[in-house]
């Protein structure tokens, strides 16, 4: 799905790179952004709308892009909610969709049950029952964006902001 080589292109087709997105390996080239490499690999949808869970893909090319939030790396260098249109591809990059990467396939499985799950259904169904402790984690994982970093960042920084 790549466009033809152009003389003004910033992409160097002689330097292939490999990266991982949502636990799948892909190939790109030096000069690609994460978004352009995903589109070139035919990954057109990698986010979900907040309210209805509709598929979202790239509609812009820069900072104005609203749908391209991804989380980079793993461990202490985990960085949530970065825009895929602003991330230059590098060899070994690891990224996941910020709008709950696991829910993209899972939501497709539970789509037939949507008519039984109106907004807030879990408050009426599970809150006052013992089942809530079992169901709560799974329901919360279906909503919201990315997770907070859970490990310590081992990098050294010259400035520390202690007011946060």
Residue map of PLM features:
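Carbohydrate-associated surface elements
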Residues: 38
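Short, structural beta-strand-to-alpha-helix junction motif
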Residues: 33-35
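Ubiquitin-like/PB1-type beta-grasp interaction modules and other compact soluble beta-rich domains
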Residues: 1-30, 41-80
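Fe-S ferredoxin-like electron-transfer domains
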Residues: 50-164
């Amino acid at each position: 799905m790549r466009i033809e080589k152009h003389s003004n292109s910033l992409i160097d087709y002689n330097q292939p790179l490999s990266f991982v997105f949502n636990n799948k390996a892909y190939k790109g080239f030096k000069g690609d952004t994460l978004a352009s490499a995903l589109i070139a690999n035919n990954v057109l949808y990698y986010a979900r709308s907040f309210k209805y869970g509709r598929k979202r893909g790239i509609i812009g090319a820069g900072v104005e892009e609203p749908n391209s939030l991804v989380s980079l790396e793993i461990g202490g260098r985990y960085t949530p909610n970065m825009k895929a249109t602003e991330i230059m591809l590098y060899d070994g990059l690891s990224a996941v969709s910020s709008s709950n990467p696991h829910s993209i396939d899972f939501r497709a499985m539970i789509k037939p049950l949507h008519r039984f799950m109106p907004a807030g259904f879990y408050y009426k169904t599970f809150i006052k029952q013992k089942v809530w402790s079992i169901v709560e984690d799974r329901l919360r994982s279906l909503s919201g964006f990315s997770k907070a970093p859970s490990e310590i960042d081992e990098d050294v920084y010259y400035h520390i902001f202690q007011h946060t």
